[in-house]
């Protein structure tokens, strides 16, 4: 999984990490200048763009997992793992940008604490679950620790920026993506699946 699934899963995130590198000094500058409105604008905009970007690739990898794994590794059995982890892309990408933003706002120590906590939990979960449940235990550990890390970072970001984001926006966006995947997966041709997914996704998100 680490050598075959994660490279495909995280390859599109290179754009997110590039954005994160640009955000850190810009947020630090705005924070030092007391430009709270600019900080809130950047945070809100970055989260929206990252969520949309991640939903596009999450659905695309879910639907194209089999041809992708066959083309890259000549191994279709890896596709089931790529489908499983592709559902976590929105959280993983949003976590990356959130972590960068709290660092830019002077919360490096908190970021380190969160990472240390989740790493300790990860080791504990793997020690307890991996021998008994195998790949399933690894997925559970990965899911729980990343949810905790993202939850703590996101909560910290909202606290220091005093930004209020209605919960219905991310929930509706994720539900729209899940519905688009469900509808698209009922077609057999891969290009049609992706086009249908994007049409349904963007149609739903324009309602926000």
Pin down the residues of each PLM region:
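Helix-loop junctions at the membrane-solvent interface of multi-pass transporters
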Residues: 63-64, 71-72, 128-133, 155-160, ...
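Short runs within selected transmembrane alpha-helices of multi-pass transporters and secretion channels
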Residues: 17-20, 80-106, 110-130, 135-157, ...
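Interhelical loop/hinge segments that connect adjacent transmembrane helices in multipass membrane
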Residues: 34-37, 159-174
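Hydrophobic, aromatic-rich alpha-helical transmembrane segments
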Residues: 7, 43, 47, 51, ...
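Residue-level detector of secondary-structure boundary/capping sites
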Residues: 18, 59, 135, 190-191
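Transmembrane alpha-helical segments of multi-pass transport proteins
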Residues: 167-208
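Intrinsic-disorder/low-complexity, polar/charged segments
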Residues: 16, 35, 130, 189-194
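Specific pore-lining/lateral-gate transmembrane helices of multi-pass inner-membrane transport
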Residues: 2-94, 98-107, 113
């Amino acid at each position: 999984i680490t050598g075959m699934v994660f490279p495909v899963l995280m390859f599109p995130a290179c754009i997110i990490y590039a954005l994160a590198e640009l955000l850190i000094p810009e947020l630090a500058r705005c924070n030092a200048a007391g430009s709270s409105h600019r900080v809130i604008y950047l945070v809100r905009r970055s989260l929206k763009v990252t969520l949309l970007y991640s939903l596009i690739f999450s659905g695309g990898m879910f639907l194209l997992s089999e041809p992708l794994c066959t083309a890259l590794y000549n191994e279709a059995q890896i596709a089931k793992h790529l489908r499983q982890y592709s559902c976590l892309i929105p959280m993983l990408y949003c976590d990356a940008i959130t972590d960068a933003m709290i660092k830019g706002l002077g919360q490096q120590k908190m970021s380190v604490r969160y990472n240390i906590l989740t790493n300790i939990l990860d080791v504990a979960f793997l020690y307890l679950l991996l021998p008994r449940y195998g790949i399933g235990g690894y997925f559970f550990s990965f899911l729980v620790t990343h949810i905790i890390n993202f939850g703590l970072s996101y909560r910290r970001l909202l606290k220091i920026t005093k930004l209020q984001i209605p919960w219905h926006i991310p929930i509706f966006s994720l539900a729209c993506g899940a519905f688009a995947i469900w509808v698209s997966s009922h077609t057999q041709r891969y290009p049609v699946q992706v086009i249908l997914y994007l049409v349904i996704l963007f149609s739903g998100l324009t309602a926000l």
